[in-house]
């Protein structure tokens, strides 16, 4: 089996690509499977790993437009990646679950109505960057 990336008239064997690029290509392959052969659920742990922030945005957009799955669960620590889900979160297309180890219930779904005012001028990633108590994020 031989796979390569063709871009701008050049061919690159997968072995010569970065880990992040290979992961991105494999996820894009999964996201673009025909619906009838697709998955009922896609779970991805830290899809932003080894990716430039610009590629993280591309990956987020591809996940949002993906039609090869019915549900998608993503675990991330990247505010840049999280930024891209703000509008879909506000519109009710995306739910965000926060891990809070200090709580009796460590998994909590964010309430979009509770964050609506803050998200007028900020993104989910912004709130993560400043360690907003509702969303958690970077330690203070």
Where is each model-derived feature located?
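Switch/communication elements of ASCE P-loop NTPase nucleotide-binding domains
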Residues: 2-139
């Amino acid at each position: 089996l031989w796979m390569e990336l063709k871009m701008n008239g050049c061919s690159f064997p997968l072995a010569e690509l970065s880990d992040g690029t290979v992961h991105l290509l494999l996820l894009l392959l999964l996201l673009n499977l025909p619906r009838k052969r697709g998955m009922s659920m896609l779970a991805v742990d830290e899809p932003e790993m080894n990716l430039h922030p610009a590629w993280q945005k591309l990956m987020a957009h591809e996940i949002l437009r993906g039609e090869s799955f019915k549900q998608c669960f993503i675990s991330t620590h990247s505010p840049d990646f999280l930024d891209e889900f703000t509008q879909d979160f506000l519109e009710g297309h995306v739910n965000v679950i926060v891990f809070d180890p200090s709580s009796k219930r460590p998994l909590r779904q964010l309430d979009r109505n509770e964050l609506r005012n803050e998200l007028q001028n900020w993104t989910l990633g912004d709130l993560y960057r400043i360690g907003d108590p509702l969303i958690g994020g970077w330690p203070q």
